[in-house]
Amino acid sequence: MPRLKTRREKRLRRHKRIRKKVFGTPERPRLCVYRSLKHFYAQIIDDTIGHTLVSASTLDPEFEKITGKRGGKSIKDAEVVAEIIARRALEKGIKKVVFDRGGFKYHGKIKAFADKCREMGLEF
């Protein structure tokens, strides 16, 4: 009898498949997102050297200043994280990125995050 696959296993399988195709370079680093049940995280990564260039999350002190709360899991919170990471990326001169949705469906928080990043000036 085939083993039932959990949501997490399916997401990790999709993530592996995506990572084979998506690779960040110095000219066009990878914008990677992760969402847990309580928080939302985003990083811009240069995969050639394996360094995180910019990061932001709902645990960030700047997020707490803007929203007045620590942590968050709503669509609005994902948009605030997008504003923070887009601003930091543009300050470092990063305008073009490759979007890595981390195996999550392009829907809800992930879509809102991507739309806000585009609105702030990131191209992907």
Curated annotation (Swiss-Prot):
Task: Give the matching Pfam families.
Answer: Ribosomal_L18p
A GO MF annotation of the entry reads: structural constituent of ribosome
Cite a single GO BP annotation: translation
Looking up InterPro entries in the UniProt record yields: Ribosomal_uL18_bac-type, Ribosomal_uL18_bac/euk
Does the record's keyword annotation contain Cell cycle? Answer: no
- TM ranges: none
**Assembly description:** Part of the 50S ribosomal subunit; part of the 5S rRNA/L5/L18/L25 subcomplex. Contacts the 5S and 23S rRNAs.
PANTHER family per the UniProt record, alphabetical: 39S RIBOSOMAL PROTEIN L18, MITOCHONDRIAL, LARGE RIBOSOMAL SUBUNIT PROTEIN UL18M
Q: What is this protein called?
A: Large ribosomal subunit protein uL18
Q: What lineage does UniProt assign to this protein's organism?
A: Bacteria, Pseudomonadati, Aquificota, Aquificia, Aquificales
